[in-house]
Amino acid sequence: MEDIPRFANDYMAEDLELVKSGCIEVAARLNDLLDNILLVGGAVPALLIDHHQKLDIATDRSDPLSAHVGTRDLDLGLAVGVLNKRRYSEISTRLKESGFKPDENASGNQTTHRWKHCDAEKLTIDFLIAPVEKEETGGNIRNLESDFSAIVVPGLDLALEDPHPIQLSGTALDGSEMSIEIPVCGPGGFVLLKALACQKRGKDKDKYDLFYVLRNYEKGPERVAHSFRPFLERGAAEAEQAVDIMEEYFDDSNSRGPRAVSNFLYGHQDDTVEADAAAFVQAFLRAL
């Protein structure tokens, strides 16, 4: 049975380091295709904030509000442009050559939207793709090849418009040392995707990730709102839905969002954290 982390202390520093190595490996292998790829998901706060803003997460990981807990997964968002000229075929071929292959579920069947590395089996890559058509349902699987697919994620097309290049140095999965630029989801796109995820799935970590970015990105909620506002100005339905979700989930400190944050962090209610979570989200919403 898959070991799914539920609380902050389930995440280890070595998990994040492995994900960083995976980022470097994938970026090096797909370097000329990165204009159609964006790093999204739980690795974003650690790179966009902790790494890019030069926070020293190595010295103190005891405070999950000041140093992101990290992730075990590498989520790659694919633009619909990969469907042109069969770029998806080039992506899968290169990843296979570097040691990645489709994962298997508990029944032994391939999960073609999730791949793992032959030498680092704790690391998985989840492939996501923006909807090709507006009516395409989120969560559906878009098959690209017989052993390669991606989960349809509404709003990903918006996030792909605001990549933040992050220079990452370290050891790739093949053991080589390098420094390479990673296209990372911007704060506005990240909050949009996380807000939608809050409603779609019941993971407490989604609420924590959202709160962490609003609390720690540069000058805080107002700066994130500046990155998010263009989505609303163009009338993007996903952005409006994300706002509605945040208003509902973080209405006050007793709402489900703040409760989920404190439960993820400590396994119980914490009045201070819950008040902060509601306050930061409300400050973001007011700044819009």
Set out the residue ranges of the language-model regions.
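Compositionally biased terminal segments of proteins
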Residues: 1-288
